[in-house]
Amino acid sequence: MPPVLWRGWIPFCRCTEEKKVRNKQVVLLIAGISGIVTGIIVSLNIPFIRQGLFYPASPVEIVVSLSLTFSVSVVFFVGAIVGWISVSEIYYSRMTGLNESSEISEGTYNERK
């Protein structure tokens, strides 16, 4: 197993060299999906504001609606990143724990011989 880097390109995320590219791809995928969802929500919000919800729509109402939409999408995006980092931390800590226990068991096996 390659050596574990204690600080990857994301702070406090332990990643191996092989996993760095995949980690970047996952974060970019999450960011892309979040951007697409934000665009869909914003594009769906504007016609409702202009035609049905607030008629006639003032610029203040449009700005408030867009800022609320943006803040909700940022909260979901940050939650996805934090969740991904914590899951990867758990995964890597379990992997290193398994490797340490296997090394210990091999050592005790060699001692018994």
UniProtKB/Swiss-Prot annotation:
Keywords: Plasmid. This is Protein TrbJ. It comes from Escherichia coli (strain K12). The lineage of its organism: Bacteria, Pseudomonadati, Pseudomonadota, Gammaproteobacteria, Enterobacterales.
